[in-house]
Amino acid sequence: MRHRNSGRSFSRTSSHRKAMFSNMCCSLIEHELIRTTLPKAKDLRRYIEPLITVSKSDSVASRRRAFNILRSKSAVGKLFTDLGPRFAKRPGGYIRIIKCGYRDGDNAPMAIVELMDRPVSSDDTEE
């Protein structure tokens, strides 16, 4: 029975899943826009939203908590210097998920995940 089991397994071990979402969070923080499958995009919200909420208060404990998930000094630095102040007034809903068709090959539903209020430049490309 599946009672009270939240989240998807994606046919991966728990350590693989943890590493995958850590890498996806780092990519989203670094590039502010990533392209992935729709189920992964929906589960990514569970990881990135609390990280951005933690980054609103810049303290050593907050940075350590974020580093424990991200494992990237550059991502933690950008999270606390750029994204924390940017979302200081926003009470939640830091990312936007946009459906973008189906992938060639296996017809998997794809989505673009982007940070809200991101600066738009003329040469933005999808990852």
Curated annotation (Swiss-Prot):
The keyword rRNA-binding does not apply. GO terms for biological process: translation. It comes from the Bacteria. HAMAP family: Ribosomal_bL17. Part of the 50S ribosomal subunit. Contacts protein L32. Belongs to the bacterial ribosomal protein bL17 family. The gene is rplQ. InterPro entries: Ribosomal_bL17, Ribosomal_bL17_CS, Ribosomal_bL17_sf. It comes from Legionella pneumophila (strain Paris). PANTHER family: LARGE RIBOSOMAL SUBUNIT PROTEIN BL17M, RIBOSOMAL PROTEIN L17. One of its GO terms (molecular function) is structural constituent of ribosome. GO terms for cellular component: cytosolic large ribosomal subunit. This is Large ribosomal subunit protein bL17. Pfam families: Ribosomal_L17 (PF01196). The keyword Ubl conjugation does not apply. PROSITE patterns: RIBOSOMAL_L17.
